[in-house]
Amino acid sequence: LLTERNVEVAIARQPEDSIAVSDANVEAWLDEYKPDLICLCGYLRLVHMKPWMAGRVLNIHPSLLPKYGGKGMYGTRVHEAVKQNNEVETGCTVHFVDSEYDHGPHVLQKSCCVAHSDTIEGIAEKVFKLECEAYPEAIRQVVEQLRV
């Protein structure tokens, strides 16, 4: 959809056989092109935020932040904590990135109920469905604001 509208898209994927995409290479590319919007997906490291990046970097997190956020809280670890603490609601948060893990201003949150009978895998499935709705919606909202 973006390429059909002449919007340039670049994707830095982590090869399955490597530990990580080179942070230095990604950082150099970002500094060169200074994109209007950077969307993180599964990026489990702290982003070295530069002044030009403020309000341009989005992340999605599998909890209703500020609950279950911070260093080391991702994926199954979040869902395990939700189950262990007998939460009745969980969800996802799309937020702007700042210099702390899972801390920046929220763009939107989507929630779902957690039944006592839900497994960790079941919770993960519910949250993933919400993430698939929330991230595109949040990106649209942010892009509309960029156009103003």
What are these regions (language model features)?
Residues L1-V148:
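One-carbon transfer enzymes
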